[in-house]
């Protein structure tokens, strides 16, 4: 009994598939880079807030709560915990598809 073999894709089809995959990977790379830049800015912001709180606590001047309220007036954005959790779980990671 002979088993029917799948015809192998032509070179042109394979190259087209590779181009499509590369294009999708480039889009994912751009998205990951934007996410990385956002996380970096959030981290720097948190470091600045932490230093401000430490200074306020050690100087005995402004309470940390008032210091935080002041930092919110600068337009600080809270970290999107759901988006960060998705990123850490790898839900937005590269997909692995084969032809």
Curated annotation (Swiss-Prot):
It comes from the Eukaryota. InterPro entries: FAM167_domain. Residues 50-77 are annotated as: Disordered. This is Uncharacterized protein C20orf202.
